[in-house]
């Protein structure tokens, strides 16, 4: 359903694991991971509403009471998945930043990495965009885990300002702008309109994201769009 430059593959969780393995096939330590994997597959196939501890236990092929050894309730399960997704996203963003030659390139790379992560791991992103489902008042680790990506983006924005490839001022405002752009692209992609629009434009979501990112970084650096440059 989701395509990134033609041929992505999920790297965060297995999608081809049989839904109902034998009930005696899990050791205690492995069960938690299988419950998370089963939940991710349910979210991608049927949406977040399909996830309950009883349903996840059935998908994992274990006793209905088994999930309670690891998760007190549904929100605890969703919180654990959200924390996992936030950590994986932050790792992807750090890798993207590491290979960028300039701060401006790093900013563009972070936007593309975020959108690519969402395309390859939609179940994680659906949860991360709905933090209230994890009841953050009971699971403060959800908000703490999400701060890593924001902190990283803010650092890159500040690097751009020092480099002269972004306007001076409060970095939090510019960070919010970039974050909103990335989430907007992701939301349009996961909900469907972006792919349809790309078909009309004769491009792909990945290519369109790269073009939008290049336009944004150019504007921040004070460069007009190509069609408006003099000479």
What are these regions (language model features)?
Residues 137-143, 147, 161-212, 226-231:
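Hydrophobic/aromatic-rich alpha-helical bundle segments in the mid-to-C-terminal region
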Residues 1-30, 41, 100, 193, ...:
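N-terminal intrinsically disordered/low-complexity leader segments
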Residues 108-130, 151-154, 179-190:
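Helical hydrophobic small-molecule/effector-binding pocket
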Residues 80, 94-124, 146, 171-178, ...:
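Hydrophobic alpha-helical connector segments
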Residues 71, 130-134:
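Short helix-capping/turn signature of helix-turn-helix
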Residues 74, 81, 85, 89, ...:
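Hydrophobic/aromatic residues within well-ordered alpha-helical segments
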Residues 34, 38, 42-76, 80:
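Helix-turn-helix
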């Amino acid at each position: 359903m989701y395509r990134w430059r033609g041929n992505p593959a999920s790297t965060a969780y297995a999608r081809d694991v049989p839904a109902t393995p034998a009930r005696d096939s899990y050791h205690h330590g492995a069960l938690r991971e299988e419950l998370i994997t089963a939940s991710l597959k349910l979210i991608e196939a049927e949406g977040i509403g399909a996830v309950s501890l009883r349903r996840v236990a059935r998908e994992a092929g274990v006793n209905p009471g088994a999930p309670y050894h690891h998760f007190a309730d549904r929100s605890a399960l969703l919180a654990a998945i959200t924390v996992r997704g936030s950590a994986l996203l932050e790792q992807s963003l750090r890798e993207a930043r590491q290979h960028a030659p300039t701060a401006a390139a790093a900013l563009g790379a972070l936007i593309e990495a975020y959108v690519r992560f969402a395309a390859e791991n939609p179940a994680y992103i659906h949860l991360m965009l709905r933090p209230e489902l994890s009841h953050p008042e009971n699971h403060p680790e959800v908000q703490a885990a999400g701060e890593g990506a924001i902190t990283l983006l803010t650092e890159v924005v500040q690097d751009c300002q020092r480099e002269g490839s972004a306007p001076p001022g409060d970095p939090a405002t510019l960070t919010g702008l970039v974050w909103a752009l990335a989430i907007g692209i992701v939301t349009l992609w996961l909900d469907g309109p972006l792919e349809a629009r790309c078909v009309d434009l004769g491009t792909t979501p990945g290519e369109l994201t790269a073009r939008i990112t290049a336009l944004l970084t150019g504007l921040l650096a004070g460069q007009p769009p190509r069609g408006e440059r003099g000479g």
